[in-house]
Amino acid sequence: MEINTRVGVEGHSSSNTVKKRIPIKVKEGNVNGLRELVKKMTTTQKDAFRKEYGNLLNLLEIEVQTPAIIALAQYYDPPLRCFTFQDFQLVPTVEEFEQILDLPLEGKTPYNYLGRYTPILTLAEIMKIHPVKLEKKVTVKGKVMGLPKGYLEWYLYQLMKKERWETFMDVLALVLYGVMLFPNVENFVDYAAITAFVAYKTQSENPVIAILAEVYGTFDQCYELKRKKMLCCLPVLYVWFVSRVSKGTLNAICPVEELLHCKPKLREPQEWVQLCADLNEEKVN
């Protein structure tokens, strides 16, 4: 975590004034069906999944308190791309996101979208499905192309019944990229998310920096374009924020597992608002 002390900065009072600048809605995707499917996996299978795809399964279990994200968003400082509170700034870092996602960058190439989406043949090979059959499932939603989450969940169920667990884990990771890491349209895995997943699967390109950039980009859109709905990377952002304002999480080997273990207090929306208003440098980890 990076904390910058900014005492007496113009435009930022040192009093604990409640801020409300942007009326945004934070929408977490429905992942209950995916959670039920994961319950069918053995411990060995879950361990194999984590070894290949990092902390996605633990992030799937995180119950995001969306009022926390709404309250945090009011302190986003677009020109500085950080969260400015009373007398300090919070800046999510690559190192923190590496830890949360359990995807170390060392020795890996960062994912960088090069302007071309994944060919259907490549995706079909990963999903072990005929390209023509898969192409028929590709649709357009919200002006973007991709695959419906409902279809992918159905396909996961078929793979589970046939005990094709290796393919099941690949398709599960694909869906989690679409609904949890790079969501754009509700209940839909678009080609941007598919391309990021395939780059990781086939080229070992690490998505951590892209996810952090997506967080910043989403907040920028909320402010500059008056975009009122926020879907992006909510479990990752929530874990980062709560681990900064909850005791005993900063030095955890994995803050996700720590949060699952300690079950953060369920707060009312106004409690999150006041928590952010009262934050100062002494109250953060």
Task: Give residue ranges: language-model regions.
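Structural stabilizers in ordered domains
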Residues: M1-N285
